[in-house]
Amino acid sequence: MTKPTVVLVHGAFADASSWNGVAERLQRDGYSVVAPANPLRGLAGDSAYIASFLKSIQGPIVLVGHSYGGAVISTAAAGNPQVKSLVFVNAFMPDKGEALGALGDRFPGSELAAALKPVPFRNADGTNGTDLYLQAAKFHQAFAADLPAAMAAVMAATQRPIVASAFMDKAAEAAWKTIPSWALVSTRDKAISPALERFEAQRAHAQTIEVDASHAAPVSHPEAVTDLIRQAATGDGSSAQPALAGAGLNTQVLAGLGMLAGGIVLTGCGLIGAARKRREPRR
């Protein structure tokens, strides 16, 4: 039986190297593994990019997303018959029409709001935006508390930012409704509330495991993550069934003062308003 290709999609405040431990283990098992760069420029564009990348792969695919990457794969996989299973690791799993900021507001518990560092930027077309980083001094405690401080410091230095407006975008699809899904919940996650992760997994009828880990589970617990991917690749876990279309709980999109970046609930309209103003072209 041909083994599927495993595609690993990272989230915010990380890069593809966060999958190194997982990729190494899967390759030893004989899997073909690719970890494309997630642009982190907005949910619609990021999902379209990954969807296009998937078309370059022949044969079955196991598509894996960490954190914000979960929202990306849930849209990118829609309509692609090669994607046989989805794996969500400490991830967002929005329903169609659901924005990540509103979803996060329904399940408070993130401790990362105070760790954000907004950095304005200008696009080539003259429009402006705001990138979100995690402050280096707060990265360890907020994102990767179960890793050595020195390792977390390197991760903080090499993190990739996400555009703030990405977390006001509404998901265009929810592929977990039609594709069997697996999910990993980190019980010590300070980025995305474990309660939110459990809710999403239950809503998606996902085969779920819980790990005593921080938000950086792919780095701190690569064997547990790899084992879950193996289950998804082999179909081991018969209770993993796609959710029926329309069967998911219809959540209200709140009136949008909350913004979530990789699980960060940023309350108040100040930064959102600033981000919107910066997107307007100069006159």
What role is predicted for each listed range?
Residues 82-83, 87-125, 163-166, 200:
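Flexible "cap/lid" loop of the alpha/beta hydrolase fold
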